[in-house]
Amino acid sequence: MLYKQYHLTILFEMKKYLTTLFLSFAMFSFAQQTPAVKDTIAKGATKTDTTEKPEKTPEEKRAEEYAKLIKKGGLERNGLFTVRKIDDKWYFEVADSLLNRYLLCVTRLKTAPQQFGMYAGEKINEQTLFFQQKNEKTLILRSYLNTQVADSTNNIYTAVTNSSSNPVVATFNVIGRNPQNKNQLIEVTDFFKQDNSVTGLLSKLKTDKKIGAIVAAQSFVDDLRAYPMNVEVQTLKTYGASPSNIPDANRVGAISFELNTSIVLLPKVPMQKRLFDSRVGFFATRFIKFSDDQQRTQTESYIHRFRLEPRKEDVNKYLSGQLVEPKKQIVFYIDPATPKQWQKYLILGVNDWNVAFEKAGFKNAIVAKEWPNDPAMSLEDARFNVIRYLPSEISNAYGPNIADPRSGEIIECHVGWYHNVMKLLQEWYLIQVGAVDKRARNLKLDEALMGDLIRFVSSHEIGHCLGLRHNMGASSQTPVEKLRDKKWVEAHGHTVSIMDYARFNYVAQPEDNIGTKGLYPRIGDYDKWAIEWGYRYYGNRYKNEFDEQEALAATTTQRLTANPHLWFGGEGRGEDPRAQTEDLSDNVMKANTYALKNLRYVVSNLHEWMKEPNDKYDYLSSMHKSAVLQYNRYLNHVLKHIGSRYIGVIGSAEVYQPVPKEIVKEAIAYVDAQLFEAPLWLYPQAITNKIGSNVEKEIADMQNNALNIMLNNVVLYKLYTQSLASPKAYLLDEYLADVFAAVWKPLNNSEVQQNALRRGLQRSYLAKIDDLINPKEQATTAANSNGAASASSTAVGNSDVRLYALQHLDKIADYLKTAQQQEAQPLNKLHYQQLLKEIEHIKEPKK
């Protein structure tokens, strides 16, 4: 109280002419003195302080609110965010240094309901997020979207920024600040517990599965764990689901999931982008580039790839051409739920990629390991690359990657490996190479053989994880006769890329004595080139990604010119018949003729090889369906050549060229010999009398489908326009004459089934011509089923295609008149007579 008494004494001794107003002001000044008063009261002084206390600063208030909550105790975990659990609520402490830092947020199923169609480990949501300070009381969470960019030194940068607002996905009240480090405390319980666009099921998934609103009372935040670079959140979420197309959910009216959400801090400085080149097949993120010196906008894409760099001390060695180990190895872990006998083969499939990375200058760049017994590690953690084993009847596997949207740097991969992929592998192997490898001819493949097949699929899926797209054109770079050359094919493989769907060498014949090195796919020359192109490190050689792009483009041109086998043919969805799924060689007509020799042998022996105990025929039925499917693949490979064109490397002299006439003629000859001459061998009685196939219907459907392509109005229009553009092209009337010759053959009275199918084929043919002359619907504007380029209905309708069809109808009529006069068999004669009547109706259709 000494300070207070001294102050009053000074006031008493002041001159008496001081006014009352001045005295009042002095007393107010006294009331502002706080430290000693507070200390005294805090020590239990009995005198009551009636003076007005000063208002606390916002910083003091936040510190007080923080202390008030923290003194309750509870759980504390330090990491990227300090995670706290107090009572039944969860909190983050967010450092100011993490504001506006990008966070990868990935939510995966930890457990999944039965018959949901997705499995534990599969991704259900992915976002890139960042916290932003709205004001001192509020943090907002935004989702980062990156579709257009501009250099910050350009004037247009401001316009681009103002037109690229990122959506707010959550808002958090700031409870207080940690007085020591100034971290902001926010409650996150409801954010993770409730449904939202960041950590919940996506709207499309809920719509597809008929999942309703979240049931809050039956949803929980189970755990939050903090690590230096990430936070892992485990939740249990229950949704209403009535009615639902998920049987169990429909019965109880609800469906529950355990989810794991990984929040991972992305690099402060993004990896330098590598810009996409359409001549090398990488997954890529597309963006629109704006700049002040443009006269039109520019679309660019940057590829997805892991950050693979030499250690600082090895940079000079690397740049001088020595192989070095990367600073950070690419590591994949094997799901411990994987059957033990298959784990080593999955590991081998991953490690096989090292041969490609050596072309990029790195040794031991990639490795697969068994999952360690470490409680601090989680399979769902987005920091780890994992091959997840999924208990599913689906016969497949897939290898996605998740990349930093700013740079394309791959952050993590979770391969989905369905248990039943082994069924597909067994079917492929038996049907395609069962004629040359006796090990395939069993109900169950031996472990070593199945392991080899798993290994190649593992390599294929890891290729996707590394950023590689399918290259369906790869197999077309192998000359067909080399596939039967034992020395050559065992040295080089039957395709230049593991990323093609070129399963096994079905061209090899039993007498060729080709071993498994010439039957299995492997990482080939294209794969090595693609990894070299995408992963070679250049240090500071280039100023930015655009300078690098210019240099790499020149290198790519040189390499492709020197070695055309490095051609990237795309995903197999275009019109180029060289880039198809499941095909082999530079001539599929020849390749598939060899393949059918093998398939005939396999089909003729299936009933012996697939014998089951207790006279069951499940395996026989399944394998026969696979054989028919394979036959149709061979057929469709051939049909794709009709009305299509080759699409070459961008920048070459001729990018687009019609498929040569000689090749199309080969295709027609194949269809004539292998389909229009009905393939009754595909349905031996030893099989059909056990599984009940409708032989005539199945073959008739195949024949009709082929005619739908060969006489499709868009296909004919393409041939017509090609003939106008080039004197070497296949003339439309010549093409129709060749197809006619394949269909309109004399009926052989001794072959009852062949006769019946041939009559049906001819009726179908005439119906297609009728459709061309008297179209019931406008020609489609979409690509036809053969993949040929689309044409508008107006263009087709206004062309000469209908005139050619009318001219062709007269040719059919002339043939029928002669045939009916020469035919003695009553049913065949009546067939010709009826077709002539149909032609009259076609020429003069009823209104």
Feature-to-residue mapping (PLM):
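Auxiliary tRNA-acceptor-end handling modules of aminoacyl-tRNA synthetases
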Residues: 35-338, 356, 365, 371-424, ...
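Solvent-exposed, polar/charged alpha-helical surfaces in well-ordered, non-transmembrane soluble domains
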Residues: 64, 344-351, 355, 456, ...
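Solvent-exposed, acidic/flexible segments
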Residues: 339-346, 447-455, 492, 624, ...
